[in-house]
Amino acid sequence: MELSYQTLKFTHQAREACEMRTEARRKNLLILISHYLTQEGYIDTANALEQETKLGLRRFEVCDNIDLETILMEYESYYFVKFQKYPKIVKKSSDTAENNLPQRSRGKTRRMMNDSCQNLPKINQQRPRSKTTAGKTGDTKSLNKEHPNQEVVDNTRLESANFGLHISRIRKDSGEENAHPRRGQIIDFQGLLTDAIKGATSELALNTFDHNPDPSERLLKPLSAFIGMNSEMRELAAVVSRDIYLHNPNIKWNDIIGLDAAKQLVKEAVVYPIRYPQLFTGILSPWKGLLLYGPPGTGKTLLAKAVATECKTTFFNISASTIVSKWRGDSEKLVRVLFELARYHAPSTIFLDELESVMSQRGTASGGEHEGSLRMKTELLVQMDGLARSEDLVFVLAASNLPWELDCAMLRRLEKRILVDLPSREARQAMIYHWLPPVSKSRALELHTELEYSVLSQETEGYSGSDIKLVCREAAMRPVRKIFDALENHQSESSDLPRIQLDIVTTADFLDVLTHTKPSAKNLAQRYSDWQREFESV
């Protein structure tokens, strides 16, 4: 099949609209069930459902004239009109209690088939029959004579299946009756597909909870459906599930100044494989591991927050305290459960911050490394090898301030290693302008600045992004300190205080702050550059 830009774009849009519709349907079902349980008095069951879904079902309420019983009654009426009998909803189970668990994979397949292949209404053919079908028509008439009741039932079903759709043939002139049929008019399938996708997306936006859904409203798969694990493993899975990031950091790609190479590689590994899976097959399979290294405060964690905001994946924010346990054997079990959960909730992203605290070099400790630490590192390496050999959409994003302390085996599994260096002059100028614009309002306060941004960008060479933010905060804080002095020194209660007027922040004030605020990692810049020349992979 030949690929084109149009095909890829429309395929992605159609798949995204279908996923949105499926997600909204699942949420609506859970809210309907919770509402029905509450109305019928099953309060404990409703509370257990809300606790397991972690969706906050009580924040939503069912619309007027909508409930689960009404929907079931309408389905029964529709089924009776179509098939002249009521549907059989449940049946008595013949299996034992141990085999009563639902077959999730088969049910999921059936739901997918129903979603993708919806039944179309039957249309009565009113075209003139061809000569080749004359014999078949005669046979049908003879059969109808033998079974007249069957013909009535079939006609009734056809009429009830039309759903108000009437089809009539186009009348032709008498001179054109014997002429060859003309080709039909050209149908703009591209326009039809675009309109259908736009209509489905807008309808979902109106019927769902929000136009920009919050990650906290994302419906996660229940741990009870985590097949293949015993009770101990499920307890560990509950521990790891607490680190699934469900809050919206509200960090967009455009909020990150610079880091263009890092943002592009993250999109190649996380965003594009989900949008355009046709392009990422074979040798073009997406990256499974990405290491961001550089001085502190340059935006490594900020980039991970952008991934949690922009990418529609399950985000695991993992630190050393998550996978390190004092109990023997629990650390490697936690690592295994982490990757199993990531596959279960795929597509997902595992963010390992301060990686050197977990994966330092083996065999370099003078007194010998602890056995439990070695087992945990080995399990982490084995699990990452499993990711590289599988087609699961699981991506490992790691950040480190000390890349020279990482184990060589871990570096091999992190396919892309990007230096997040100190910001350039243009980036520093943009940061200063962002934090100290000419006029900035913060509720009741209005701060004015008169800064030469080009001069300040030269003077802040060697400062990281967090250092520049700290300098800007200190420069803005100096006029505010004068307000504190006026408020504290005012003794007379009869006289009113004057209107608050902040002094203008000038270039001299900013330069004075620079003399008292030094960069945090200027001396390590050369060491990062040397390590980059030896281990870079972009």
Swiss-Prot record:
Biased composition annotated in UniProt, kind: Basic and acidic residues: 138-147
Enzyme category, top tier: isomerase
Keyword Secreted found: no
Catalysed reactions, semicolon-separated: n ATP + n H2O + a microtubule = n ADP + n phosphate + (n+1) alpha/beta tubulin heterodimers
Region: Disordered, residue numbers: 94-147
One GO term of the biological process aspect: microtubule severing
Any single GO CC term annotated in Swiss-Prot or TrEMBL for this entry: microtubule cytoskeleton
Start and end residues of each LisH domain: 25-57
Transmembrane segments: none
Enzyme Commission code: 5.6.1.1
Any Pfam family the entry gives: LisH
UniProt-recorded Gene Ontology molecular function terms: ATP binding; ATP hydrolysis activity; microtubule binding; microtubule severing ATPase activity
Residues engaged in binding ATP: 294-301
Principal location listed in the UniProt entry: cytoplasm
Listed Polar residues bias regions: 115-135
Function: Severs microtubules in vitro in an ATP-dependent manner. This activity may promote rapid reorganization of cellular microtubule arrays.
Family (UniProt): Belongs to the AAA ATPase family. Katanin p60 subunit A1 subfamily. A-like 2 sub-subfamily.
HAMAP family attached to this UniProt entry: Katanin_p60_AL2 (MF_03025)
Protein name: Katanin p60 ATPase-containing subunit A-like 2
